Regions:
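Short amphipathic alpha-helical molecular recognition features
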Residues: 3-4, 31, 199
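Alpha/beta-hydrolase active-site loop
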Residues: 1-19
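Alpha/beta-hydrolase
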Residues: 41-204
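Alpha/beta-hydrolase fold nucleophile elbow
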Residues: 21-34, 38
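Substrate-binding/catalytic groove segments of enzymes
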Residues: 16-22, 51-52
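Eukaryotic intrinsically disordered and solvent-exposed regulatory patches
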Residues: 15, 37-40
Protein backbone atom coordinates (compact mmCIF):
# COMPACT_ATOMS: atom_id res chain seq x y z
CA UNK A 1 0.00 0.00 0.00
CA UNK A 2 3.05 2.23 0.20
CA UNK A 3 3.07 5.40 2.29
CA UNK A 4 -0.26 6.76 1.01
CA UNK A 5 -2.42 4.71 3.38
CA UNK A 6 -0.87 5.79 6.70
CA UNK A 7 -0.47 9.40 5.57
CA UNK A 8 -4.09 9.73 4.44
CA UNK A 9 -5.73 9.68 7.89
CA UNK A 10 -3.20 12.15 9.31
CA UNK A 11 -3.85 14.53 6.43
CA UNK A 12 -7.62 14.25 6.88
CA UNK A 13 -7.38 14.93 10.60
CA UNK A 14 -5.10 17.90 9.98
CA UNK A 15 -7.55 19.39 7.47
CA UNK A 16 -10.48 18.82 9.84
CA UNK A 17 -8.66 20.61 12.66
CA UNK A 18 -7.29 23.36 10.45
CA UNK A 19 -10.68 24.29 9.00
CA UNK A 20 -12.89 23.34 11.95
CA UNK A 21 -14.75 20.66 10.03
CA UNK A 22 -17.39 18.54 11.73
CA UNK A 23 -18.96 15.13 11.16
CA UNK A 24 -21.27 16.80 8.65
CA UNK A 25 -18.25 17.42 6.43
CA UNK A 26 -17.73 13.91 5.11
CA UNK A 27 -14.73 12.58 3.21
CA UNK A 28 -15.20 10.79 -0.11
CA UNK A 29 -12.15 9.09 -1.62
CA UNK A 30 -11.79 9.05 -5.42
CA UNK A 31 -9.37 7.06 -7.56
CA UNK A 32 -8.87 5.02 -10.68
CA UNK A 33 -6.60 2.03 -11.34
CA UNK A 34 -3.98 1.76 -8.55
CA UNK A 35 -5.22 4.93 -6.81
CA UNK A 36 -8.67 3.37 -7.12
CA UNK A 37 -7.49 0.39 -5.13
CA UNK A 38 -6.14 2.77 -2.49
CA UNK A 39 -9.50 4.53 -2.23
CA UNK A 40 -11.26 1.20 -1.68
CA UNK A 41 -8.75 0.06 0.93
CA UNK A 42 -8.73 3.36 2.81
CA UNK A 43 -12.53 3.18 3.13
CA UNK A 44 -12.26 -0.33 4.59
CA UNK A 45 -9.36 0.48 6.89
CA UNK A 46 -10.60 3.85 8.14
CA UNK A 47 -14.42 3.75 8.01
CA UNK A 48 -14.62 6.23 10.89
CA UNK A 49 -12.86 8.82 8.71
CA UNK A 50 -13.88 7.99 5.13
CA UNK A 51 -17.62 8.11 4.50
CA UNK A 52 -17.41 6.54 1.05
CA UNK A 53 -15.16 5.86 -1.91
CA UNK A 54 -15.46 5.77 -5.68
CA UNK A 55 -12.94 3.25 -6.97
CA UNK A 56 -12.86 3.02 -10.77
CA UNK A 57 -11.08 0.09 -12.45
CA UNK A 58 -9.56 -0.76 -9.09
CA UNK A 59 -7.59 -4.05 -8.95
CA UNK A 60 -8.10 -4.73 -5.25
CA UNK A 61 -7.19 -8.41 -5.49
CA UNK A 62 -3.84 -9.56 -6.85
CA UNK A 63 -4.14 -12.11 -9.67
CA UNK A 64 -1.17 -14.05 -11.00
CA UNK A 65 -0.69 -13.78 -14.77
CA UNK A 66 -3.49 -11.20 -14.97
CA UNK A 67 -4.58 -10.90 -18.61
CA UNK A 68 -7.83 -9.02 -18.14
CA UNK A 69 -6.49 -5.63 -19.18
CA UNK A 70 -4.83 -7.02 -22.30
CA UNK A 71 -8.20 -8.44 -23.30
CA UNK A 72 -9.60 -4.92 -23.06
CA UNK A 73 -6.68 -3.62 -25.13
CA UNK A 74 -7.33 -6.27 -27.80
CA UNK A 75 -11.01 -5.37 -27.92
CA UNK A 76 -10.17 -1.68 -28.38
CA UNK A 77 -7.60 -2.38 -31.11
CA UNK A 78 -10.32 -4.37 -32.89
CA UNK A 79 -13.04 -1.71 -32.63
CA UNK A 80 -13.51 0.66 -35.60
CA UNK A 81 -15.50 3.08 -33.42
CA UNK A 82 -12.29 4.06 -31.57
CA UNK A 83 -9.95 3.83 -34.57
CA UNK A 84 -9.09 0.14 -34.46
CA UNK A 85 -9.77 -2.77 -36.80
CA UNK A 86 -9.71 -6.55 -36.81
CA UNK A 87 -6.64 -6.35 -39.05
CA UNK A 88 -4.83 -4.14 -36.55
CA UNK A 89 -5.52 -6.45 -33.61
CA UNK A 90 -4.56 -9.51 -35.65
CA UNK A 91 -1.27 -7.93 -36.75
CA UNK A 92 -0.40 -6.96 -33.18
CA UNK A 93 -1.04 -10.54 -32.04
CA UNK A 94 1.02 -11.86 -34.96
CA UNK A 95 3.94 -9.57 -34.09
CA UNK A 96 4.08 -10.74 -30.49
CA UNK A 97 3.70 -14.39 -31.52
CA UNK A 98 6.68 -14.02 -33.85
CA UNK A 99 8.73 -12.32 -31.15
CA UNK A 100 7.96 -15.21 -28.78
CA UNK A 101 9.59 -17.53 -31.31
CA UNK A 102 12.52 -15.23 -32.11
CA UNK A 103 13.68 -14.96 -28.51
CA UNK A 104 14.16 -18.73 -28.36
CA UNK A 105 17.19 -18.73 -30.69
CA UNK A 106 20.44 -16.79 -30.89
CA UNK A 107 19.66 -15.83 -34.47
CA UNK A 108 16.29 -14.53 -33.35
CA UNK A 109 17.82 -12.51 -30.50
CA UNK A 110 20.24 -10.95 -32.97
CA UNK A 111 17.33 -10.04 -35.22
CA UNK A 112 15.44 -8.45 -32.32
CA UNK A 113 18.53 -6.52 -31.21
CA UNK A 114 18.90 -5.04 -34.68
CA UNK A 115 15.23 -4.42 -35.46
CA UNK A 116 14.39 -2.78 -32.15
CA UNK A 117 17.78 -1.13 -31.56
CA UNK A 118 18.04 -2.59 -28.06
CA UNK A 119 20.83 -1.22 -25.86
CA UNK A 120 21.98 -4.78 -25.16
CA UNK A 121 20.96 -8.19 -26.50
CA UNK A 122 17.84 -9.54 -24.78
CA UNK A 123 19.20 -12.76 -23.30
CA UNK A 124 18.05 -13.29 -19.70
CA UNK A 125 14.50 -14.29 -18.82
CA UNK A 126 13.90 -11.12 -16.79
CA UNK A 127 15.28 -8.84 -19.51
CA UNK A 128 13.06 -10.64 -22.02
CA UNK A 129 10.01 -9.96 -19.85
CA UNK A 130 11.02 -6.31 -19.59
CA UNK A 131 11.42 -6.11 -23.37
CA UNK A 132 7.98 -7.57 -24.03
CA UNK A 133 6.50 -5.33 -21.33
CA UNK A 134 8.01 -2.26 -22.99
CA UNK A 135 6.50 -3.30 -26.30
CA UNK A 136 3.12 -3.91 -24.68
CA UNK A 137 3.15 -0.43 -23.16
CA UNK A 138 2.87 1.02 -26.67
CA UNK A 139 -0.62 -0.40 -26.86
CA UNK A 140 -1.75 -0.41 -23.24
CA UNK A 141 -1.07 3.27 -22.62
CA UNK A 142 -2.47 4.33 -25.97
CA UNK A 143 -5.72 2.46 -25.34
CA UNK A 144 -5.99 3.82 -21.80
CA UNK A 145 -5.55 7.46 -22.82
CA UNK A 146 -7.01 7.34 -26.34
CA UNK A 147 -8.09 10.84 -27.42
CA UNK A 148 -7.65 12.19 -23.88
CA UNK A 149 -4.20 13.78 -24.01
CA UNK A 150 -3.59 16.31 -26.82
CA UNK A 151 -0.63 15.32 -28.96
CA UNK A 152 -0.46 11.76 -27.65
CA UNK A 153 -0.77 8.82 -30.06
CA UNK A 154 -4.24 7.43 -30.61
CA UNK A 155 -5.47 3.95 -31.44
CA UNK A 156 -5.87 5.11 -35.03
CA UNK A 157 -2.23 6.25 -35.05
CA UNK A 158 -0.79 2.96 -33.83
CA UNK A 159 -3.08 0.94 -36.07
CA UNK A 160 -1.85 2.91 -39.07
CA UNK A 161 1.61 1.50 -38.30
CA UNK A 162 0.44 -2.03 -37.60
CA UNK A 163 -1.64 -2.29 -40.78
CA UNK A 164 1.15 -1.13 -43.10
CA UNK A 165 0.97 -3.79 -45.80
CA UNK A 166 4.43 -2.90 -47.12
CA UNK A 167 6.09 -4.56 -44.10
CA UNK A 168 5.60 -7.56 -41.83
CA UNK A 169 4.01 -7.16 -38.37
CA UNK A 170 7.31 -7.31 -36.45
CA UNK A 171 8.91 -4.65 -38.66
CA UNK A 172 5.81 -2.51 -38.22
CA UNK A 173 6.01 -2.96 -34.45
CA UNK A 174 9.68 -1.97 -34.50
CA UNK A 175 8.82 1.21 -36.43
CA UNK A 176 6.02 2.00 -33.98
CA UNK A 177 8.31 1.41 -31.00
CA UNK A 178 10.99 3.68 -32.43
CA UNK A 179 8.38 6.40 -32.93
CA UNK A 180 6.70 6.12 -29.53
CA UNK A 181 9.27 4.66 -27.16
CA UNK A 182 12.92 5.02 -28.07
CA UNK A 183 12.66 8.01 -30.44
CA UNK A 184 16.11 7.41 -31.87
CA UNK A 185 17.80 6.24 -28.67
CA UNK A 186 18.52 2.59 -28.00
CA UNK A 187 15.78 0.61 -26.26
CA UNK A 188 16.71 -0.16 -22.65
CA UNK A 189 15.28 -3.51 -21.55
CA UNK A 190 17.32 -4.03 -18.40
CA UNK A 191 15.23 -5.64 -15.68
CA UNK A 192 17.68 -4.44 -13.03
CA UNK A 193 17.53 -0.84 -14.25
CA UNK A 194 13.74 -0.96 -14.43
CA UNK A 195 13.50 -2.21 -10.85
CA UNK A 196 15.97 0.39 -9.63
CA UNK A 197 13.76 3.12 -11.08
CA UNK A 198 10.66 1.72 -9.40
CA UNK A 199 12.44 1.52 -6.04
CA UNK A 200 13.53 5.17 -6.15
CA UNK A 201 10.72 6.72 -4.09
CA UNK A 202 12.22 10.20 -4.15
CA UNK A 203 12.49 10.57 -7.92
CA UNK A 204 10.92 13.66 -9.46
Amino acid sequence: MGIAMPIGPHLMMWVCNRYNLTSKNVWIAYGGSYPGALTAWIRVKYPHLVYGSIASSAPVQAVENFIGYNEVVHASLSAPIVGGSEECAANVAAAFATIDKLIETQEGVTSITEKFNTCAPVTTANDTLTFVSNLSNNFQETVQYNLEIPGSPTIMDICSYMTNSASDPVTNLAALTEKLYSKGACMDNSYAASNAGLMNIVRA
